Amino acid sequence: MKTKIPDAVLAAEVSRRGLVKTTAIGGLAMASSALTLPFSRIAHAVDSAIPTKSDEKVIWSACTVNCGSRCPLRMHVVDGEIKYVETDNTGDDNYDGLHQVRACLRGRSMRRRVYNPDRLKYPMKRVGARGEGKFERISWEEAYDIIATNMQRLIKEYGNESIYLNYGTGTLGGTMTRSWPPGNTLVARLMNCCGGYLNHYGDYSSAQIAEGLNYTYGGWADGNSPSDIENSKLVVLFGNNPGETRMSGGGVTYYLEQARQKSNARMIIIDPRYTDTGAGREDEWIPIRPGTDAALVNGLAYVMITENLVDQAFLDKYCVGYDEKTLPASAPKNGHYKAYILGEGPDGVAKTPEWASQITGVPADKIIKLAREIGSTKPAFISQGWDPQRHANGEIATRAISMLAILTGNVGINGGNSGAREGSYSLPFVRMPTLENPIQTSISMFMWTDAIERGPEMTALRDGVRGKDKLDVPIKMIWNYAGNCLVNQHSEINRTHEILQDDKKCELIVVIDCHMTSSAKYADILLPDCTASEQMDFALDASCGNMSYVIFNDQVIKPRFECKTIYEMTSELAKRLGVEQQFTEGRTQEEWMRHLYAQSREAIPELPTFEEFRKQGIFKKRDPQGHHVAYKAFREDPQANPLTTPSGKIEIYSQALADIAATWELPEGDVIDPLPIYTPGFESYQDPLNKQYPLQLTGFHYKSRVHSTYGNVDVLKAACRQEMWINPLDAQKRGINNGDKVRIFNDRGEVHIEAKVTPRMMPGVVALGEGAWYDPDAKRVDKGGCINVLTTQRPSPLAKGNPSHTNLVQVEKV
């Protein structure tokens, strides 16, 4: 029956101010950029027109994707079918209490993922070349037998180090269904029962910042909770865009807004793109060339040092290597940070605002003004998102940005921050144990294609192999569970295609997924997984400010088609591999959940009973300390609470990095340095390649997708079109108008997509939202707007991570 939309709904007016205000704050950010308003009104009207039946059930479920949030979904089910989706209805919008955990446009469209035409229906095996997407249907028994037989053969011939668990975050929030890190998955538990597997370290989101700030603070760098901004006088965000990357669930973007309303803190955004985090709520946007954040910081530091705006007492007491007083004896003369900034170090170049301006594109007078504001305003919440670190010089850039918080003594205090991304409170909920991996070898998550191509050549000193001096064998089998990094989310797709097409190299690829993704098309055996709506699990929060929560993700509907849960699949494989008892310990999936929940109640006594929690749907608890303050104990007593760095202090100069720089084998242009210096890295604005490819291409997390997840949902694609963002000045030079089809290209590939001509991009820079589904034609020209056709597989120097935002391209009108 056709639903008639009331004219009054379509005629309703929304003020520009009201629309902009709503955009990023409430997680409905799709409205602000090219979403036609009748779209949302029609959707609402259609939902309202759905009749309520007496047998309707409302069942708690969750969206468990890798967006930094985990959201409860209240599924309305009639006759075994999901009719519509609502979100959390417990609590209110006051972030001082147990507030609602509201799903965004993505989670609310979960029904369209469950019933998507792309759903995998039954097990299949490849019959064409890898990547062609040609498969034939097989039984589950045949699929299990093929996998078990071939895996045993490969282990016997090459050893367990030849079996690799690929990076996948499609169901990150689950307890039983968790897909990352690989060591915490049910596939890992299965492999650990069978002798282990080749592990990976790092991740595509934060490899460089995790490695870089490890040498500054020791371990993962913590940050203050966003709620603590209510104590701040100034907020400075480097490439941090919670308005899109943290727009739902724990609501980091809403914490930011409510906290600023209390503190009236000025907010300055430093980013090549004017993001939804701004959207009229920022006080200043400073556009900057990608990959030059460290140069900007150095220029700021020059002003702070020469105008006596640094916190000398803090630097003397808590830090190593700021000046001669705290420089390690092993360091060279004038090897300290102050000497480097003032031009008294080995390069002899003073890092003046004028010097920084030439590199960054930020005017020198603006650098001076910003330095004085940061140096004279305290406390200041200085943070960086994960955009600046996803570069060829990402590790060293993260250390540089953190220097602003260190120089001003904003670390370990209310209203301040460490210079890292915001932190949050978490609950000690128990997840599925996965046993110990007997294989100690690991590689960077970004270098698995190299491990297929030249595994035995990869060494610790040249390629970052950990656990041994070198790899002994290449990767011969890949498990790809709930991930699209086999193709779509991995850099330089055309190179990956060439490597994977040769099935004599990697002999077996098993893909477990819900949809026919780009990666699924490269499977040898393809297994259909259940969605979160088709099984029972617990979902845990991620970035959630100072209120943590757990969601009871109940089974909403029966598994569709022949889909099975990951626990069913791995249990059946364990049976064929002779390790069933060790793997299952005699428990079903629900029995494991009850077992884990009982353990969690011991750690969190406030949790209700299992059955009460099932009805309740969500458990929330606020941080008993109020706001989370990173390194507070260290600040209060550094001797009693040292950091995990070698010195126990904040290491501005890192002797460990000096040792690595002296011993590792690096390609020309790669730099590892004991100080947070500026180094351009490859394919920078200053690279000679700029003459051929004059535009810098950067990526961003688009609000309609979580990486590639939800990238096949029609209404989200219509609401938030995939476009290449380009400044009017660059567009005019090329005769490009808004909406024109353009070709973006370099030596690695070519993408055809529409142009979005907007002053929200810095001149000389273009941007593509990452995660769009790869859609090549016969000549391998991508028509889907997938940025990884253009990115490089050359890793960053220290973390060996993905430099996804370091790209030079040319753009032409088609």
Task: Give the role of each language-model region.
Residues K2-D7, P182-I270, A295, A405-Y522, ...:
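Extended redox/cofactor-interaction regions of prokaryotic respiratory oxidoreductases
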Residues K2-L309, G335, A460, K468, ...:
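N-terminal export/assembly segments and adjacent metallocofactor-ligating motifs
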Residues G168-T169, K317-V320, I374, N417-L427, ...:
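A glycine-rich phosphate-binding loop feature that marks nucleotide/adenosyl-phosphate handling sites
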Residues K262, R273-T377:
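Long, well-ordered, tryptophan-enriched scaffold segments
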Residues E282-I288, S548-P559:
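Short beta-alpha connecting loops at secondary-structure transitions
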Residues K333-N334, K338-R454:
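Active-site phosphate/pyrophosphate-binding segments
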Residues E507-L508, Q555-A574:
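Phosphate/diphosphate-binding loops
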Residues I566-Q616, S708-Y710, D714-W725, L729-V814:
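Long, contiguous, secondary-structure-rich segments that constitute the structural scaffold
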